[in-house]
Amino acid sequence: MKTTIYLNDWFYNSGIVGFLRILDYNNDNFAEIKENYITFETNKLKNFHKYYFKYFFDKYNVGLRTKEKIEKSFEKIVNFLNDETLDNKEIKKIQENLKTEKKYVKDIIKKQLDKIKKYDDVTYTNILNEYNKIDKIKTKEDVDEINHIKEIITKEIQKDSINKRLTLNLFKSILSKNYFGQISFLNVVKNALTFEEQEKIMYKDYISNIIEIDFIDEILHDKYKIEELKILIKDKLDNQEISKEVIQIYTNIQKRFIDKEKSLDEIKDYIQKNVFAHCYMCENDKSLTSNYSEGNFIPLAVSSDNMKNFFWNQNAEFPICDVCKLILFCIPAGISSVKKTTKENVNGQVVHREKEVNGFVNYDTSVDDLLKMNNYLSQTSKVDKSIYNPYEELILNIVEQQKNLQEWQLENIFIVEFETEYLAFSRIEYFNIKRYIAKFFVEYSQNTLNIMKDYRYKIQIMDYILKNKDLKYIINSRLREELSKETQNGFNSFIATRIRLILNLLKKEDMEMDERVKKNNAKLSVLYNLGVSIHEELKAKKEDNKLDGYTYKMLNSIKSGNKKEFMDVVIRIHMSMGKDISPIFLEVMQDTDLDFESIGHSFISGLISNKFEKKDE
């Protein structure tokens, strides 16, 4: 039977992305991707439980991960042993590093040893014997011994029976803690079962009902006679690869109808009235359903049976079909793990800490766009995020790659970030792109943001834009940084000032906004170029050493909002050069569209630049 799955809420869409990723990883793309839905024959799901386990096994492969860590660590140990320095300080440092590295590799091995001890004494003993030899490694003559230890330990940990159990328990723990709790094979009581036995549990709990609906639908379409039906149902009941719900259905058909020699029409009537139910999530009327609860997705559900008082008339029923249940079970494969650096106040000190959160970008224009966008997020989230934020990088990529991008397309982007721990807490944050920001990206970013060459600065500006923070703080800070450099560069900060001006004007949503942006951009350019001109004249007179003092004073006056002090410095600069004050300052100070920060930052950006800088950029 063919089923169709349409784009829906963000968490359902993340399940669709996960479902497609699992199929793609297993080279069986049986689902057809249409504009806003996917479709496939449900009998193609017969091996999906194996695909699911393979996807997560390869993603969290403990044996491979441990092998790579051990090899890398032993390589460092060998390098320390082979170092032939004669300097006493260096020798002492090498010995300390060697001791640290040996402790590190022992901790890696010990972590797995403690788990292996519970279910394989022979493997545990083999690894433990080699583990105990690590501390005896002290000279370069022990290099061969190191290689032997490494070979034995990595070989033992990568044994199929060991690695499968270690990896299965790891990804079960992750899925249970962050997404589904203690349901199906994720329940800790199933840990004693083999990898293959737990695969079968998933088949029974998540796939068998979908397959059996095909068979039940065939009964409704008169594919079988009573005699054939009797044999088929008996085989299915004997096979025991079906869920308890379906066992009950087939038992009822067998005892109430077939054994009592009732007609096929009576069986069909029973199915229509008592078997099929309506799914509240996908609106499918031909399905077996179960109640939506925390076992379907912890961050957006509660234990319905235990919290009926929270529901109107204590009605906690929200039936969903088995196809939706399977799609939701694919959410972990559709979510990207994003590393973020957060600031925390610890005993009065600002401490930067790295943590992982779950991220998803909902973009419901099409399935293809949704998949591409989240695949890009997944790739960029693997980069060092102490510097870059994958969300900003994602939007930058969209803007730069899609020249004909429409505002509504950016407004449709909906970013979700969540952290969850089963039975502990759940935190979800959402943000989308405001209309004026979307207009900026579509109409103005090509000639502002995209021409900035300093990528880190660009990403910082993106972060401020998306979080609706005032760019004046980052511009002021950047200009101060430039003053401490040997080669100063103010052009990027001038572009940032233009971006800030445009955003402030776009917030007003004036009908003649384009003309106002153009007019005020021109004024900022005059201020920037005036600063460049003064820089060049002072440089020609060998008086450019005065610039830093002037600039710091002006930056301080901008930060404090002191226009009088700023203009005093401007006047002093002009007087020292024997020039009249440029009329542009009088004009812009009276302009209602231009704020003090934009005026000051544009002039300072030029003042610390030279006439070749823009060309170099």
State the predicted function of each range:
Residues 189, 193-382:
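Basic, glycine-/proline-tolerant helical and adjacent loop/strand elements
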Residues 301-483:
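Domain-exit/linker segments immediately C-terminal to small folded modules
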Residues 1-208, 406, 410-617:
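Long, contiguous all-alpha helical interaction modules
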